[in-house]
């Protein structure tokens, strides 16, 4: 993912967590906040509840790829944070992709509804 499309500063992550809306799924948590830009920015987090460093990095790679496959449908102007939950590495690829797609749809970012 290009650097200009990523959330990088802790200030941005804190702002999305503080001011944004959240949508939950057993595999991941989605936080969104308007960013008043012409493009979206994405951030992926995996805490220690996911497992050790290898498990956290694997979870982030899998979520990043699932988000990448769904992101063309996302409308512009949002900061999106996806937080991995415990069972994310045990889930199959289609289940994970469906979870991310469902979270984006629930948030109204899939292009079918304007938020």
What is each PLM-predicted segment?
Residues 1-115:
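Positively charged, solvent-exposed patches that mediate nucleic-acid binding
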